[in-house]
Amino acid sequence: MNHRGKAQIMLIKFDIYHDGDWWCARGMGVDIFTQGKTLDELMKNINDAVELHFEENIEAGEEITVVSLTEFQVGSVAKISGC
């Protein structure tokens, strides 16, 4: 916490992409990389990787909250007749 008693928020952005059979996440601005077979597994692995990366900070009493915002680019969708 900072000197005013408010927890500091650390925002870590991840580049998430699909590579073969794996969903991959690369931290932007931090050396974190993880992967999972599903998006749910990837999100769990991101949380685990962040905890490991910032282990010393957590042991020193800092609170780190992972907030995920996922954005996907979708290709063109076929037009459905009648719509």
Tell what function each PLM region has:
Residues 30-40:
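A short, exposed loop/beta-hairpin motif centered on an aromatic-Gly-Thr core
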Residues 1-15, 44-83:
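Short, charged, surface-exposed hinge/linker loops at domain edges
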Residues 20-22, 31, 78:
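Residues that cap or initiate secondary-structure elements
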Residues 24-26, 35, 44:
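Short acidic, gly/pro-rich beta-turn/loop elements at beta-sheet edges
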Residues 19, 41-43:
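A periodicity- and composition-biased signal for non-globular, repetitive helical segments
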Residues 27-28, 59:
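Residue-level signal for pocket-adjacent positions within structured domains
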Residues 15-27:
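Short aromatic-glycine-(Arg/Gly/Cys) micro-motifs in beta-strand/loop hairpins
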